[in-house]
Curated annotation (Swiss-Prot):
Protein name: 2-oxoglutarate dehydrogenase E1 component
UniProt biased composition (Basic and acidic residues): 925-936
PANTHER family according to UniProt: 2-OXOADIPATE DEHYDROGENASE COMPLEX COMPONENT E1, 2-OXOGLUTARATE DEHYDROGENASE
Gene3D superfamilies from the UniProt entry: 3.40.50.12470, 3.40.50.970, Multifunctional 2-oxoglutarate metabolism enzyme, C-terminal domain
UniProt xrefs under InterPro entries: 2oxoglutarate_DH_E1, 2oxoglutarate_DH_E1_bac, DH_E1, KGD_C_sf, ODO-1/KGD_C, THDP-binding, Transketolase-like_Pyr-bd
Source species: Bacillus velezensis (strain DSM 23117 / BGSC 10A6 / LMG 26770 / FZB42)
Oligomeric and partner information: Homodimer. Part of the 2-oxoglutarate dehydrogenase (OGDH) complex composed of E1 (2-oxoglutarate dehydrogenase), E2 (dihydrolipoamide succinyltransferase) and E3 (dihydrolipoamide dehydrogenase); the complex contains multiple copies of the three enzymatic components (E1, E2 and E3).
A Gene Ontology BP annotation from the UniProt entry: tricarboxylic acid cycle
Known cofactor(s): thiamine diphosphate
Known function: E1 component of the 2-oxoglutarate dehydrogenase (OGDH) complex which catalyzes the decarboxylation of 2-oxoglutarate, the first step in the conversion of 2-oxoglutarate to succinyl-CoA and CO(2).
Highest taxon of source: Bacteria
Length: 944
């Protein structure tokens, strides 16, 4: 990549006199045959291009050029040397605090490039380093300046950044000395005080709570002042929201010093009895607990920060499990939500300056966890970009007991970021001033280019993976060096004293004051006492569940909404076949009064928007729909221009977002969860391409969506649409694994539904939207249809939208009301219910012995409605649960205890479906069809 920078530094005006004459002679040779000259010269002329005419006229003779025939080659070699220093200088940098002399031999000797000091002195400094400080007067001084710049305790990698403007800006920041301006004594003193707090807090925990896990920050103490400075600079520039994601290493220290969580609360958590009375009453720090709670080093917090210039900002450390790196897209989703205004129709209005994402990674986890690459891939996508996240690798050079050469195949932990053209700074965590330079670089780069930036903060881990672990058993040499190594607080204090910036007395006074604050806080913690074991109780709104809400929409309002949905500009050319499909939707309110699935969805969206609730829908192919059913974004067949009818509703003051997502489940679902947590008033929806692929995001279902409220008090109303149904498409396109969601279902933690009618879908979406800001809110998982999208048995009468509501139990239409004759009730959920309905409608003869109902809401189980159904059937003998999934999958294992509990005395509960299998579905469509027919037939066949 050195040619780009050479072009930045050299042009034809840099040559004059004999040198210019020789350069022109060489260029003529290059023009005749580019391969006939030295490769470095060829690269140079490739970039310089043809000389301007006035240059040729001003040149000397060829004879003059031959006087210094090799000078131009020396210049090319010098430029190559300079570029090599920029590209590879990091290899000679002092960024490892435990290794003081990283390279015994100097890289980039002049002799390797065929150069001497005298020759370098003859070259202008501007040819080598355009941005060098004014005191650099020649090429030799310029090269030495570059060597010193790129081999400090901070080093740089940006050769992978291809944008010329970015590279030029980065180069100027580094080489001009802009990054390395001296900090004021006051700021350095404040950094020392912060490092003293960081160390003092850890050492107090180490002495007081012996052997308890805390995942100490020691060895990477500088992380805290780094965060302080990122936040301070960002808030000063206008940021009003900062979202931080990090794992457990150093988390308690960040909570205490960056989030302002009082020491006494953290100490009380070590007593295994968090004292919620200790939470600050003024509300500057928000700390929430769920009813089952979590360990102290997973908890997050909110802080309302006010700086000296009266600028305020909300700082959030996201709640996080021990699943490393999975918090990343959640933080970015929250950041995007904080950046957007959603109180107008159309797409939200994004202001990237309003919110900042800071993601703290582990050196083993950053290259090791695939979710990192998934999240980095979001960084430039219009539906997900956040104007640049600042990444910090908290690099202690070890993962539990695993060395770096065992945990990654790259030189640096940060190398993955190169694929996304993210500038990288490696910095020694024992040099706080270098760390502040890295912060300045990151903040200024993001401000200018709205892109990600990475700081590789290289330190060490003073203790084992946790405080009960002895690291010397596996890394004896490393931990011998660590034990002998002074702390960064001590190193920095001695440096400031030696430079006369503070006195020894002041350094000691800082330490004394910090120790007193910590000890005073500990005195506030009540004495530990053994409380009686108590039953964990759910908050009343959670326990009570959803109240009945009115979700019907007046017929005339629906008709008007429908008209707006098919109202595109006259000049807009809708694709012919699609146009006919959309125009048929008008008949739903004129002729047949029938609403199919996709129209019901669009009407639900339109009515929710009219109610003032913003909507965000993303997923693979979600604009059109995997099954070409949705078509929310129309494309002009002649110009490609887009039109979204939901952006043009009359009297609407809520935004509508729909984006096709990248081919990722984990990062996208995590992003939408984070967006929803930050923006609880928005109906946020994620759609899987097929429900089968949702398990690629299983961590988010298990650790966050199903359990986040119980662990952290973190509410969510996220909607997940998982296409599900057995249609002979094999084991990868049949099952959304409903059994997994039902296994996780407890404590009213989410709604799991498997729907069979357009009206049911309409009402459940509207119900979810109406519940968003209420305490009862919970996530919604819907097993959505595929072939049923166009099945006439799933269409609904318009009247069902305008007069009805969501029905957890949905009775088959066309049944006899001779309830006393019924001996079998067939219960099912989802697509198999439609198969049963089709077969039932074709049956001849006596059918009064059968009653059929669909359990549309699987969880929370509608016990009351189901019990009332059974009560209508006085002679009931059999309750049959029918499913198309294998017996060890689907809803059977979950629902059979519920049915047995409420079944009338003496009535058996039976199973009809596929037998237990390891794979969810058959691969052969013929075998599938035969098995499906058996299941349906058995469910509707009377026993002899």
């Amino acid at each position: 990549m050195f040619q780009n920078n050479m072009k930045q530094r050299m042009n034809w005006e840099d040559f004059y006199g004999p040198n210019l004459g020789y350069a022109l002679e060489l260029y003529d040779q290059y023009a005749e045959d580019p391969d006939s000259i030295d490769p470095d010269l060829k690269d140079m002329f490739d970039e310089l291009g043809a000389p301007p005419s006035q240059i040729k006229e001003a040149s000397g003779t060829k004879e003059q050029g031959r006087v210094t025939a090799d000078l131009i080659q020396k210049i090319a070699a010098a430029v190559k040397l300079a570029e090599d220093i920029r590209t590879y200088g990091h290899l000679n940098a002092s960024v490892n605090p435990l290794r003081k002399d990283p390279k015994k031999s100097e890289l980039f000797p002049l002799s390797d490039y065929g150069l001497t000091e005298e020759e370098m002195k003859a070259i202008p400094a501007s040819v080598i380093c355009k941005d060098a400080p004014a005191n650099i007067t020649n090429g030799l001084e310029a090269i030495q300046h570059l060597r010193n710049t790129y081999k400090r305790t901070i080093s740089f990698e940006f050769d992978h950044v291809h944008d010329f403007e970015e590279r030029a800006w980065i180069t100027k920041m580094v080489e001009s000395g802009e990054l390395f301006r001296k900090n004021s004594p006051e700021k350095l003193s404040a950094v020392l005080e912060r490092l003293t707090e960081v160390e003092g807090f850890e050492q107090f925990l180490h002495r007081t709570f012996v052997g308890q896990k805390r995942f100490s920050i020691e060895g990477l103490d500088a992380l805290v002042p780094v965060l302080d400075d990122i936040i301070a600079q960002s808030v000063k520039a206008g940021t009003t929201n900062v979202n931080i994601g990090m794992a457990h290493r150093g988390r308690l220290n960040v909570l205490a010093h960056v989030l302002g969580k009082p020491y006494e609360i953290i100490f009380s958590e070590f007593q295994h009895a968090p004292n919620k009375d200790l939470v600050p009453s003024e509300g500057s720090t928000g700390i929430s607990y769920g009813w089952t709670g979590d360990v102290k080093y997973h908890l997050g917090a909110d802080r309302q920060l006010q700086d000296a210039e009266t600028k305020s900002a909300r700082i959030t450390l996201a709640n996080n499990p021990s699943h490393l790196e999975f918090i990343n897209p959640i933080v970015e989703g929250s950041t995007r939500a904080a950046q957007e205004t959603r109180t107008q129709k159309g797409y939200p209005v994004q202001d990237e300056t309003k919110s900042l994402a800071i993601l703290i990674h582990g050196d083993a986890a950053f290259p090791g966890e695939g979710i990192v690459a998934e999240t980095l891939n979001l960084s430039s996508l219009k539906g997900y970009q956040v104007g640049g996240a600042i990444h910090i690798i908290a690099n202690n050079m070890i993962g539990f007991t695993t060395e770096s050469d065992e945990s990654r195949s790259t030189k640096y932990a940060s190398d993955l970021a190169k694929g996304y053209e993210i500038p990288i700074v490696h910095v020694n965590a024992d040099d706080p001033e270098a760390c502040l330079s890295a912060v300045k670089f990151a903040v200024e780069y993001r401000k200018r280019f709205n892109k990600d930036f990475l700081i590789d903060l290289i330190g060490y881990r003073r203790y084992g993976h946790n405080e009960m672990d002895e690291p010397s058993t596996t890394q004896p040499m490393l931990y011998d060096a660590v034990r002998k190594h002074p702390t960064v607080k001590r190193i920095f204090a001695e440096k400031l004293v030696s430079e006369g910036l503070i006195s020894e007395e002041k350094a000691q006074n800082i330490e004394t004051a910090v120790t007193k604050r910590i000890e005073d806080a500990y005195k506030k913690v009540p004495a530990k006492k053994e409380d009686a074991v108590r039953e964990i109780e759910l908050p009343e709104p959670v326990s009570n569940g959803f109240p009945d809400v009115d979700t019907a929409i007046d017929f005339d309002v629906l008709r008007k909404l429908n008209g707006e949905l098919i109202n595109w500009p006259e000049s807009f050319n809708v694709f012919g076949k699609l146009k006919r499909i959309l125009e048929r939707r008008a008949k739903a309110f004129d002729d047949d009064r029938k609403v199919e699935w996709s129209l019901a969805e669009s009407l639900a969206f339109a009515s929710i928007l009219k109610d003032g609730t913003p909507i965000r829908l993303t997923g693979q192919d979600s604009e059109r729909g995997t099954f070409a059913q949705r078509n929310l974004v129309l494309h002009d067949s002649e110009t490609g221009e887009e039109f979204v009818a939901l952006h043009h509703l009359d009297d609407c003051a809520a935004s509508f977002t729909v984006h096709n997502s990248p081919l990722s489940e984990g990062s996208v679902l995590g992003f939408e969860y984070g967006y929803n947590v930050y923006s609880p008033e928005t109906l946020v929806m994620w759609e899987a391409q097929y429900g089968d692929f949702a398990n690629a995001a299983q961590v988010y279902f298990d650790q966050f969506i199903s359990a986040g409220r119980a662990k952290w008090g973190q509410k969510s109303g996220l909607v997940m649409l998982l296409p599900h149904g057995y249609e002979g498409q094999g084991p990868e396109h049949s099952s959304g694994r409903v059994e997994r969601f039902l296994q996780l279902a407890a404590e009213n933690n989410w709604t799991v539904a498997n729907l069979t009618s357009a009206a049911q879908y309409f009402h459940i979406l509207r119900r979810q939207a109406k519940m968003l800001l209420r305490e009862e809110i919970r996530p919604l998982v819907i097993m959505t249809p595929k072939s049923l999208l166009r099945n006439p048995n799933t269409v609904s009468e318009v009247q069902e939208l305008s007069e009805s509501r969501f029905k957890p139990v949905y009775e088959q239409s066309g049944l006899s009301h001779a309830y006393e004759k019924v001996t079998r009730v067939v219960l099912s959920s989802g697509k198999v219910s439609i198969d049963i309905s089709d077969h039932f409608n074709k049956m001849e003869g006596d059918k009064d012995w059968l009653h059929i109902a669909r359990i549309e809401q699987l969880y929370p189980f509608p016990a009351k409605d189901t019990k009332e159904l059974f009560a209508k059937l006085p002679n009931l003998q059999e309750i049959v649960w029918v499913q198309e999934e294998p017996q060890n999958m689907g809803a059977w294992s979950y629902i059979s205890p519920y049915l047995s509990e409420i079944a009338p005395k003496g009535v058996n509960v039976q199973y009809i479906g596929r037998r237990r299998r390891s794979s969810p579905a058959e691969g052969d469509p013929t075998v599938h069809k035969k098995e499906q027919e058996r299941i349906v037939s058995d469910s509707l066949t009377r026993k002899n």
